[in-house]
């Protein structure tokens, strides 16, 4: 990935004179990230954890841990939050989604936080299907074909998902202070695909109301809305980048690859869900022109 990252020594989070032009909030409405503009680019502030300066072109990032913040926390924030945003500033298409390699093709899962993107990817991986990304779904057009670009080789899971799917058999990165999620490193029990794969399907995850795995086709207009809603964008007010991003997702939305997917949120159902996804993706592949 074309980002030059350099972690700096810890420093205090000094007050910023300008108002933030955007912010992310967590599930309890606390501010998770402040977005500021600077002369040379952007400042992303994660309160009490780290500051990141991103160059205007998204190619250079410097990170400063807050005093007392662990290096593992800064690494996690960079990989899962800052890097996708920096790549978006380069014009890369970055989405909130996980992906796996099914028979040489990329199959992605997109949805709001808590819909089970990481759990699905981990479930496939523990069943022997290599994962491409846990989040920060990176798509690129190569020779007229849209491909999934692999991300970093780790998966984040809540404790109950880890216990149900993996147990204590995987290598775990150091604990993070701001979440009880574990970051599980790829290995023999969680195989990772480190090569780009042609995008075959994108499934948008439902709320878990279905009693059996249910897959339904989405129209291009529906897919466009879902893609836009689940995009990483560093500067939501930069008109040139917004115009390019809209063109990118509009082109992507024309592909006949979008489906809604809902299923019971029970670990016991996951083998059935995996089977339904594989069968559906392969059937669609056989009938593709």
Which residues are covered by each model-predicted region?
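Post-Walker A alpha-helix
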Residues: 120-121
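Glycine-rich, often acidic-flanked micro-motifs
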Residues: 98, 102-112, 127-289
């Amino acid at each position: 990935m074309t980002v030059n990252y350099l972690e700096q020594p810890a420093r205090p989070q000094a007050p910023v004179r300008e108002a933030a032009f955007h912010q992310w909030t967590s599930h309890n409405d606390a501010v998770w990230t402040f977005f500021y503009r600077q002369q040379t680019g952007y400042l992303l502030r994660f309160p009490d954890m780290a500051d990141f300066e991103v160059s205007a072109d998204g190619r250079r990032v410097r990170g400063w841990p807050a005093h007392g913040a662990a290096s593992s926390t800064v690494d996690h924030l960079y990989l899962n939050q800052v890097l996708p945003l920096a790549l978006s500033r380069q014009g890369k298409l970055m989405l909130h989604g996980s992906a796996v390699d099914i028979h040489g093709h990329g199959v992605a899962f997109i949805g709001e936080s808590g819909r089970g993107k990481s759990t699905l990817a981990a479930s496939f991986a523990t069943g022997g299907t290599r994962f491409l990304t846990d989040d920060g779904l990176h798509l690129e057009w190569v020779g007229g074909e849209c491909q999934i670009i692999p991300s970093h080789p780790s998966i984040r899971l809540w404790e109950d998902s880890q216990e149900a799917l993996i147990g204590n058999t995987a290598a775990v990165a150091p604990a993070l202070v701001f979440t009880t999620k574990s970051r599980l490193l790829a290995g023999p029990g969680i195989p990772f695909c480190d090569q780009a794969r042609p995008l075959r399907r994108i499934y948008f995850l439902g709320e878990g109301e279905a009693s059996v795995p249910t897959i339904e086709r989405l129209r291009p207009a529906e897919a466009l809305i879902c893609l836009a809603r689940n995009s990483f964008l560093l500067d939501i007010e930069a008109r040139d980048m917004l115009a390019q991003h809209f063109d990118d997702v509009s082109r992507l939305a024309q592909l006949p690859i979008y489906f809604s997917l809902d299923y019971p949120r029970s670990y016991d159902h996951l083998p059935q869900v995996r089977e339904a996804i594989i069968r559906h993706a392969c059937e669609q592949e056989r009938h593709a022109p």
